[in-house]
Amino acid sequence: MVTSGDSNRVRTHHVVEDTRTPKWLRSCGPRCVGGRIPLLLWCGLAGAIGIGGSVGDVGAQDTTRARPLQAVRVTVTRESARSVLDLPFGASRVSIDSARTGIRRASLTEMLFNVPGLEVSNRYNPTQDPRLAVRGFGSRSAFGIRGVRVMRDGVPLTQADGQTAVDFVDLEGVGSAEVMRGAAGALYGNASGGVLELKSDPFPSRGFEPTVRYVANADATRLSASSAGSSGAFGWRGTATHNFGDGPRDYSEFRSTAFTGDASWRGSAGTLRAQLTRYDSPTAQNPGAVTAAELRTVPTVADSQNVLRRAGKEVGQTLLSLTGDRTWDAGSASATVFTGWRDLYNPLAFAIIGLDRRTLGVSTRVEQRGMMRNHLWRLSAGADVQSQRDDRRNFANCAGQATLPSLPNCPTVNQRGTESIHQLEKVASAGLFARGEVNRSVVTVTGTLRGDQTAFSVRDYRALYAVGGAVESRTMSAVTPMLGISLRARPTLAVYANIASSFETPTTTELANRPDGSAGLNRDLKPQRGRTLEAGVKGIVARRVFVDLAIFSIATRDELIPFEIPNSGGRRYFRNAGKTQREGGELSVSTTVGPMDLGGALTRLSYTYEDYRVGTTVLDGKKVPGVAPLSSSLFATARRSPGFFTVEMQQGARTAADDANVNYAPGWVLWNARVGVTRWAESGVQPVVGVDNIFDRHYAANIVTNATRGRFFEPGAGRRVYVSVRVGRVSAR
């Protein structure tokens, strides 16, 4: 989607040769969506595109919401900012508070709405991060984010083992997000699905900018205060946010506080930037998943075992980073040093997990550009080194045991019973990459090569003096190439293709959760590897109409699959599937028609096992669970000074919940709406009133694949009315 969060109006002129409505949109039929209501809306959008393509010069329009395509630039390629048309893979940039004015900045689900190929599931569970999946990668995540590399302002949030926790990230200061869709191994290493980079709001060019935001509904309240300013070469921003409430379900109370500090100094040769994030969550209850019957009738109910065992989470996390950038006439270089720590106390139904984590990392890159025989060339290279040190202790969860006979693991009435695991887990990852690009006229050829090595080691303190030693180690490595080509069919339209590879290791948690319950590393679990073929087209196909279309085929070997063991209390274990095959396509369309912004995204996937056996059961040909075969979204925003009105639709198809394809989550369609004032006179007050899930549908917001006790579904929230008020002054940027 081509949008801009800039507050100043900009007049633009798109160079477009063909103003006719695309034939494939005019002939929109049932196959293009697969549902009557979304079908009508998608065809309505196609009709609006036809209108948008026939209206006069775009330069005569208010383009605060749509910038020229050449100006839509991303840095997710690990280079200086590039036009999306130069990239031989799917990439999206979302500017916050642009076409979708009035969002609350409360969750990634809301922020990344309408990005094709990207599924963000809000679990409505305060102990769980949203599930973020790109082209199905990441859908297996039991907690946190897997399979997708996540960064903020170039600082990795993903740990050395590939796991990402984003509960500590305050989105109040985020101004935009960039998504790289597809195999990211050649650029970032341990990531199968792609990359998400969050970009902070720019500092004011001068002056002082204080802001306060209040957001509330019946079960949650969010208070945020921020202040930003600049003086000469120095810029700064500080944001503090407090969240609290009872949650949309039984036993889902939460309370958290986050602080983010950001300071930058710009000199004649480059910049120096320091960032600090601190997060504390002393209360977060875990309501767990529900059965199909509960999803239909009482989706707000909590798992009785979670309530009995007082399942929840207490966490504190700090991240500190320092980044230096330097530029010269034909190149640039940057280096980032970061460190962090995370303290976790996590009672679950099957155990109590205590974790003390320390992390350290360095990322560097250098880029050089030049001309040779009328060819523009660009070379870049870099290195990433990360370390992760986890002191893990597991205890029996004895909550609810007071009225029962004493057990060996629960000799007292305290919640924390005897210790079952005490081990030191270390992960060290190192990667080197090089990227080359040659451009002549309308053709750009890109090649990338990366080598990675990830070393895991575990020291079992409980077996320190055991025969055979107490230290286990494993090392996983990969070389991941990528080759792509991009062709400018018109100045504002590009066709591209690529072949790429990916590599994804198990996390320390996935390796440590051994089905036999013993300490150490699961030596049977292998890294997941894949190869992607992709082709697509992106750009302006008619005046004001931006289209991003991609088709892809992904062959994966040793895919990591989660499962549960009966009577294990919901603990997640992992195994490898022999081979899986992913085929799919994704489409996004956005346009502006008079005072209205319109947009839609559609993702169609077919993911199957090709070689997968569990015991004597052959699962070849079965659908990979947890991945919706069809999902779509639409939005429309109407503006009339000083206000706006937005309506949104989201759709998810019926989705398998287990490897055998016996249990399914039903399909669903949700509607949201909001109305607000963009700026009330000179006071800077921006009130918004909205309704989520207008028709109060019962649906599965997330699927717990291969769960036991029939608890496959984490329900979404019912109808919720909310109020948001932002008071602030906007300075020049």
Model regions: which residues?
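N-terminal periplasmic "start-of-domain" segments of outer-membrane beta-barrel proteins
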Residues: 71-103, 109, 129-133, 148
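Short acidic/polar hinge/loop motifs at secondary-structure boundaries
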Residues: 148, 155-181
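Short strand-turn segments of transmembrane beta-barrel domains in outer membranes
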Residues: 176, 183-185, 194-229, 240, ...
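Transmembrane beta-barrel wall of Gram-negative outer-membrane proteins
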Residues: 215-244, 249-286, 311-328, 360, ...
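Conserved C-terminal beta-signal and adjacent last beta-strands/turns
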Residues: 226-228, 379, 497, 601, ...
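Membrane-embedded beta-barrel scaffold of Gram-negative outer-membrane proteins
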Residues: 229, 323-327, 332-345, 488, ...
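Surface-exposed extracellular loop regions of Gram-negative outer-membrane beta-barrel proteins
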Residues: 284, 289-295, 387-410, 455-464, ...
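Gram-negative outer-membrane beta-barrel transporters
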Residues: 366-368, 373-374, 439, 445, ...
